[in-house]
Design a protein with these regions (language model features):
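Hydrophobic alpha-helical segments
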Residues: 1-188
Length: 188
């Protein structure tokens, strides 16, 4: 099987524009390597800074890591981004999601009713260009989601959507995997 090549240049700390260097150094200090998505974003220092800032702020928000990963998995599957599904499946395992819950999140579902209510809200929002019926908003609130958390969830959708769009537009190859994660058929 031939190696998949990105449509965009995949930079490292030596080839990236100088304006991207501070963020790349920060990413390298955390994991010791850059993933292909960050390497691609480095081509645009403004896009890289915007993504890094939004991601950093949202990680300090009120949503648990498992909720953040459920949202990212759902959006990645919705967009058909194999790259993001694989990345967030690994991240989901790291925050305690089991394989069944990862599979459910890819379909905007969860065994946890509270999580499921938020995912239904977000699925409807994506499918209806941002329009969410009042009953789904109220259902999310009845399950304990605050306005702050719902707004953060919407921001996580935007972040995951941006990542999926970049990985799809750039046909960014996934690094370091031993198996591919295929998108599910159609989200039910």
């Amino acid at each position: 099987m031939a190696a998949k090549i990105s449509r965009f240049d995949i930079h490292d700390e030596l080839t990236a524009p100088p304006e991207s260097a501070p963020i790349l150094k920060g990413a390298l200090s955390g994991t010791g390597k850059l993933n292909n998505f960050v390497g691609v974003l480095a081509s645009s220092p403004a896009a890289l800074r915007g993504y890094a800032r939004m991601r950093s702020e949202l990680r300090r928000g009120t949503l648990p890591g498992a909720t953040q990963e459920r949202i990212a998995l759902a959006v990645a599957e919705y967009r058909g981004s194999e790259y993001d599904v694989a990345v967030h499946a690994r991240a989901g395992r790291a925050v305690g999601l089991d394989l069944d819950e990862i599979d459910s999140a890819r379909r905007f579902h969860s065994r946890d009713e509270r999580e499921a209510a938020l995912l239904r809200y977000l699925q409807t929002m994506l499918e209806n260009s941002g329009v969410v019926p009042v009953h789904l908003h109220e259902e999310a609130r009845e399950h304990g989601w605050t306005d702050e958390q719902i707004l953060e969830a919407l921001a996580h959708v935007a972040l995951a959507d941006f990542s999926s769009l970049v990985t799809l537009a750039g046909e960014i190859p996934l690094e370091g995997t031993s198996r591919e994660v295929k998108p599910l058929k159609k989200v039910a």
